[in-house]
Amino acid sequence: MPADLMDEPTRVLAIRHGETAWNVDTRIQGHLDIPLNDKGLWQASRVAAAVAEEGITAIYSSDLMRAYQTAEAISRATGVPIVSDTGLRERGFGEFEGFTYQEIAERWPEEAERWRKRDPEFAPRGAGESIRVFYDRCVAVATRLAAAHPGETIAMISHGGVMDCLYRAASRLDLAAPRSWLLGNASINRLLHTPGGFTLIGWSDTSHLEGGALDESNDRVGSAA
């Protein structure tokens, strides 16, 4: 690849998967393979239509069903094949997976408090990932994928936690900093990638959805949990 092309920025459309029943229930999915619900399938079709004319040359997706189903809609709209990458999976939540926020608070109150306060070193029991380990994974994978497409536009379909990591990387924010930005289902998040890293262009675009999108995370400033 010519050296001058290597310096060209990559446009990244980072897209969170559509809604699932467990999103509605505030039940932790993590690495569990939960499909989109009917609304999520509709959201996937809407986000696909929204990005169909963006000139996407590559689609990368988490292998988990909720992300892959969203990617399939985008692939149908653009004619671009999907490349699955396990590095784009959601954070591994160990024993928290399958439980609601309230159930976690009742079963593991001390661990739940460390999680809610974004302790970077806290990892849920049962092979869960700490925020620091998860962040390093997400940024490394996203950097590898974006660096392979200088001067192009790519789509990464992934999860709320991955979107949060990309926002923090692009904004140079501390991992423990409280979250005030949205991570809505089927939202479009726009970044540029250069050899210097990621830059934020636009965030949480849900203009293609009627009535916005669900952000059920428990760590956002002003959230109920």
Where are these regions (language model features)?
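Short, hydrophobic/glycine-enriched beta-strand segments
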Residues: R11-H17, I157
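Active-site metal-binding loops of divalent metal-dependent hydrolases
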Residues: G18, G160, T206
